[in-house]
Structures are given as C-alpha cells and as structure tokens.
Amino acid sequence: MFRKKKKKRPEISAPQNFQHRVHTSFDPKEGKFVGLPPQWQNILDTLRRPKPVVDPSRITRVQLQPMKTVVRGSSVPTEGYISGLLNDIQKLSVISSNTLRGRSPTSRRRAQSLGLLGDDQWAADPDMYLQSPQSEHTDPHGLYLSCNGGTPAGHRQVPWPEPQSPQALPNGMAAKAQSLGPAEFQGASQRCLQQLGACLQSSPPGTSPPMATGRRGVKVAKHSSEEARPQSCLVGSAIGRPGGEGSPSPKNQESSLKHRLFRSMFLSTPATGAASSSKPVPLPQNKPNSAFRPPQKDSSSNLVAKAQSLPSEQPMGTFSPLTTSDTSSPQKSLRTAPAAGPLPGRSSPAGSPRTRHAQISTSNLYLPQDPTVAKGALGGEDTGIVTHEQFKAALRMVVDQGDPRLLLDSYVKIGEGSTGIVCLAREKHSGRQVAVKMMDLRKQQRRELLFNEVVIMRDYQHLNVVEMYKSYLVGEELWVLMEFLQGGALTDIISQVRLNEEQIATVCEAVLQALAYLHAQGVIHRDIKSDSILLTLDGRVKLSDFGFCAQISKDVPKRKSLVGTPYWMAPEVISRSLYATEVDIWSLGIMVIEMVDGEPPYFSDSPVQAMKRLRDSAPPKLKNSYKVSPVLRDFLDRMLVREPQERATAQELLDHPFLLQTGLPECLVPLIQLYRKQTSTC
C-alpha cells in the first residue's frame, strides 16, 4: 500500500528523417582527408598554400607599453636622482616604437639603444646617423617633412594656421574629426599634458631640464628659454612662432598642444606639392628653414598613393604618417614648392560605377634642394612617430560608422590569410550571406597596408573585382564586408582537375579586364595568383585580395617594396629594382603555368630558392609544353619576359589571338561542380 512506485523509464525513439550528409575518411594513397565539411577543408587547404611575404625590414614594430618607474627601498630622491634615472632608461631598447612608414634603426642607433655606445659618442654628431646610407643614396636631394615641428633654436618656420571653422579644413576633415567625440579627443590631449607636466617637474626648480627623453630613447636638446616651446610626448617639439614672441602662457600651451596632437593624428603628406593657399609662401632655397602650407583637397586615388607608399627610401621617424617614399628618379619625383595656386587632383576613374570623395585631409610636402636645409628643419629630432591610437583614428576616418555585430549573425570561419581570418556571416535584415575579413591591427606586418583593403576596393569597382559592401573598425580589428563567392578560389579547382584552353582563356580574359582597369588607375595588385581569383557558382571570375596592392602616379611612378608571394614574384621585385604595373603581368603568366601544370614553377623548392631562380635564371617554361597549342605558348611568352619594358600590357594581351578562344562563364561551371562534389562526398 505504501510501497514506492517505480518511475517509468523514458522511451527514446529512433532518429526521425535522418540523413547521412557528411562522412569523413582518410585516403592513404592521397595522404589526405576526404569528405570534410567545407569550412574545415578550406582551413586545411589554406595552411598548405604559400603565404605572401613583406620585406622584413618594413615590418611594423609593436608599440611598447609605457614604462613605469618603481622606487624601492628607502632611497631619498636627490637633485640628480631623476636625471640619473632618465639616463638609465635611455639605455633600454625602446627604439622599436610603432611608426608608420618608419625605417629600421641603423646599426649606430641599435648600438646606442643597447648601451654599446656611450652618451658622449652619440652626442658628438647625432645628425650623421639620422639617415641610413640607403636613404641618402635614393633621396640625394633630401626628402624631409617636419609635420610636428622640430627646428633648432634660431630656425623659424611658417606657422600652421589655426582652423577657425569647419570650412577651414578640406575634404570634410572637421566633420570626421568631430565624429570621434570631444571627450575622446580631449582625453588624449589631457594624457599628453599630464605626461608633459611630469617631464617638466622632473627638473629642479629654477632650472630647465638639460635633456628630454622621447619615447624612442633618443635625446632631444631643449631650446633656449626665449624660444622654448612645450614638448609633446606624442608629436615632438612645436613649430616656432613668428615675430619673436616669448614663452606662451599655460592656456596657449594647452591649446597649442591640442592643435599639434590633432595635426599629428589626422594630417599626412601627399605625393604632390600643390598648395591650396591663395597666397603661397615661397620656399627659400638658401636659408636653413622650411616652409609649410595649409592642407589641400585631394582625390581618393592620390590618397592611396600617399597612404601605401613604398617605405624603402624613408628614414625612421622623419616622416608623418601616410607618406610617399618610392620614387624612380629624384629629378622627376622630387619637386620644390610651386609658386602658383593649387593643382587639380586626379579625377575619379572613368569606369567606376560611383564616385566617392577622399575622407583624409593631407598637408603639402615641400622638398628643400639643399640637404642641410632639411637637416635644419628636423633639428635632429624624431618627428614621425605614430601611436596605435593615432593610427586607429586615421583608419576610423575611412571606414563606415557603426557596429557590424548588430547587423550580422551566424559566423562560420571559412579561411585564413596572412592578414587575418575570413568568416561567412548572414545579414539579419536581408538574410544575404557576406564574407567578413577580420584583421587585427596589432598583428599586421605592415599596418598601413590595411588602407588598401578599404580605399582601393571602395573606390575602384569593376565587374571582375570583388565588391566591398562596408568596412568597420571593431575594437582592435578592421572588418571588411565583401560579397561571398560560393564557387571558391581558382586554387581549389586547379589542384583537382586540369583546365582546357577555352577555360584558361576565359579565366585570363576576366583577370586581364580587371587588371587593365586597375592599371589605368595606377593600381598595382602585387599578389596575382590562383588564390586571389574567386568564382561564382555561375562561372563568373573576380579578382580579390587587395591587401598588398600599391598605387602609382606621376609623382610616384615606380615602387620598390619586396611584396608578394615568392613563387609568383617578378624578377624586378625580388631584385629590389624599381617596378610598376608590369609585375602583375608576370604573376599572371605564372598563374597560367599553374593552370596548365597544376602548380607554379619551382614549387618543390623552398621559397628562398625559388626566388633566387626566378631572379637569376631564364623565364620558367611549361612542364607539359607539348600539350598546349602554339598560340597559348606565344601568349605565355608575351607575359614571362625578364625586361619589364618588353613585357606586354594588360590591354595588349586582351587583343592577343589566344583570347579568341574565350567562352562564356558557363564553361567553368562543370569544374566548380566537380570540385564541390569531390569535397562533399567520399
């Protein structure tokens, strides 16, 4: 009667509507897994592919955390305590602070930062080691900019006019700067003032501190008392006032520091020397000073040439962010200040579906003809230091406002590259699938190349170029939302099957259409390979991966950076010679070999060995040349020419007889379907 009832055991039914969609197994003959889910397969394939490389000397150094002074024990600070502590700090290796387009430290500076050279040896002639021999060789006329000041006592500069209204700043810079929020901007200024006050209070009362230690551990000489300006811990010394004014009041000091901080965060140097002032100040050629003019309006095409310029000829810490430094000849690219009014910027590309205005204002760059003039303008100080927050502020001006995490969901990682990862996401409001490229700003080899991901794809739109929808700054990451091409990369296809000549011609014609358009706008892709070619399910071919591209112009007609993927690099890139758009044609020729043979030349060699063979040997040949027609061999020979001047252009190749075999995009659909079938089933 009172016995406890047994609970009924729950009945578990068999699965309903069960479908065995995924079955993963290992093929011992091929030595690989088969039947993996697409996102897993993409990750494995990505890890096997060679990664693009960047010149190691151009890798952006990570900004060091500010050093905290810890006083232990019962030591009582004396009059020389602070100065002695600063001398000890100066011997620490803090020379690797983050700079945009900064040159690697010279051997002299590395020895100084490690304490191998004494202070007296450095103070004997510090200006001798401000530039490396390479920079003096490539820029004999002295390409200098003192964006944040930096003149020794007695050397005056023309002051930068204070912006009185939003109309005073070009390209809508005032509106963009206000979008950052007054609290954020004022907070940065207050931190700068607090650091400045700590530096000034470290000296005994009544005396001026003999030396000020910058962030990079390099001594900066103080000016005389009648010309002394407050030293910003972020942007270096100030620009001297005209008219022989004395020391400014504390209120003027604060406003001046805020102004210089604003300029260091948002102003850059263009490739042109045009001035926007109606009354330009001529540049004296025989006096040891430099003249500067207000910012000018600039097109977004010239912006990229400034933002992603080659860093090989630029000394560390001498330029402000987003400067151009690659030049083919000093006579053509280095110009003195013009005496006339502004020059019109290059108009938007003719083939672009929509026109956008540049969102970064730029200042003018003037080149003194006498190297001693530039040295006097710099005053032996490091002026081009860009902190992580300043770089984020500059990047924030070219991206869209908002938080994409509120608009997207269902993230699935589908790939990984040298700059970040790629995820597949779904838009909440439309249900459309988009590809999201997420790049951590702190983990970039060259963070300034991130501007390419935004500016190039935004301003240059073409039927054969992957469309970019939006770009956002999410915390410490740059998110770029692009169209999702479900056909995958060309690499996936050619690794499984071989293309016939009609299919090869169809791919080449689409890529050449994109290159002809980009080259006409002065854009060099610099990473053409099968991984950068994406396909849609209906067989359309599109060019992607603009993270390593560069822009050339009349003022910067050539580049010199070692950028690209080793097996596809042109000989002139490997040999560090000046190059232009011809390097993309060579890489396309290597990609044609890849479509015929299944892999690029020298793929079994190490990347370094392959680069040596590409640089020193004759142009590579097809392994199976007997399998292709003579017209395809001639098409390939027009691209793989060692002399860039003799190499065919993209427009010339579009008229080649081989492209008469070009078929409709549907001819590539069987290849896409075959690959998807092989990766989804055993």
From Swiss-Prot:
The modification Phosphoserine is found at residue 561. Transmembrane segments: none annotated. The active site is at 527 (proton acceptor). Keywords: ATP-binding, Cytoplasm, Kinase, Nucleotide-binding, Nucleus, Phosphoprotein, Serine/threonine-protein kinase, Transferase. Residues 12-25 form the CRIB domain. Autophosphorylated. Phosphorylated by MAP2K6/MAPKK6, leading to PAK6 activation. It is an enzyme of class 2 (transferase). GO terms for biological process: learning; locomotory behavior; memory; neuron projection arborization; neuron projection extension. One of its GO terms (cellular component) is cytoplasm. Residues 408-659 form the Protein kinase domain. The keyword Acyltransferase does not apply. Serine/threonine protein kinase that plays a role in the regulation of gene transcription. The kinase activity is induced by various effectors including AR or MAP2K6/MAPKK6. Phosphorylates the DNA-binding domain of androgen receptor/AR and thereby inhibits AR-mediated transcription. Also inhibits ESR1-mediated transcription. May play a role in cytoskeleton regulation by interacting with IQGAP1. May protect cells from apoptosis through phosphorylation of BAD. This is Serine/threonine-protein kinase PAK 6. It comes from Mus musculus (Mouse). The gene is Pak6.
